[in-house]
Amino acid sequence: MFRRRGVTLTKALLTAVCMLAAPLTQAISVGNLTFSLPSETDFVSKRVVNNNKSARIYRIAISAIDSPGSSELRTRPVDGELLFAPRQLALQAGESEYFKFYYHGPRDNRERYYRVSFREVPTRNHTRRSPTGGVVSTEPVVVMDTILVVRPRQVQFKWSFDKVTGTVSNTGNTWFKLLIKPGCDSTEEEGDAWYLRPGDVVHQPELRQPGNHYLVYNDKFIKISDSCPAKPPSAD
């Protein structure tokens, strides 16, 4: 289960391989850091944008994970289970293109998680002298981690809400997002977003009070309380 403070905020996991970090406005962009492959399809694409002022090469690496989080266990995916194309992209400044992911794994009722790392590599290695006399790259390699969720081929989207106890439970076999905004007039930044995997339970006192409370599943909003007029927030 993940919690995100501020429902419009995005927590990017960026790793600069060298000591200089590129400005976020001039680096790789891949959109939402969690994306899903729906149960009824075997294909999903992810758009990559080069926001730099010069050309970049993009590559990806995939690890199977038992469950997203700080203590996740990473393993090599079973051969042929999750394929992608192309092997790499070469994008000029401002260009964008798609990586495509193809699932050929089991068609059962279990949800599967993969950590997909997008690696942005400069086409040229520009360097400068550091104050200590060393050589530092001015265009670092950047790695952005995302999570691909393959929804079960036999999907069951189920949930329960108990207003008395302030509890939302994921009783199905696939993930969804819970948006909690305390009060009917609170801002997006005052809300919380929770990512509930199968079996996860959220207990929050705000769920017992009036507020805008939604589930987000397959980009659709589901209002779970009638204490405020319907006004769907952003899903980002």
UniProtKB/Swiss-Prot annotation:
Signal peptide interval: 1-27
Report keywords, A-Z: Chaperone, Fimbrium biogenesis, Signal
Report the InterPro entries cross-referenced here: Ig-like_fold, PapD-like_sf
What upregulates or represses it? Negatively regulated by H-NS. Positively regulated by IHF and EcpR.
Instruction: Answer whether the UniProt record assigns the keyword Signal to this protein.
Output: yes
Q: Which Gene3D superfamilies does the record cross-reference, listed alphabetically?
A: Immunoglobulins
Which function does this protein serve?
Part of the ecpRABCDE operon, which encodes the E.coli common pilus (ECP). ECP is found in both commensal and pathogenic strains and plays a dual role in early-stage biofilm development and host cell recognition.
Family membership = Belongs to the EcpB/EcpE family.
Remarks, miscellaneous: Not expressed under classical laboratory conditions, but is functional when constitutively expressed.
Stated name of the protein: Probable fimbrial chaperone EcpE
Report the source organism. Answer: Escherichia coli (strain K12)
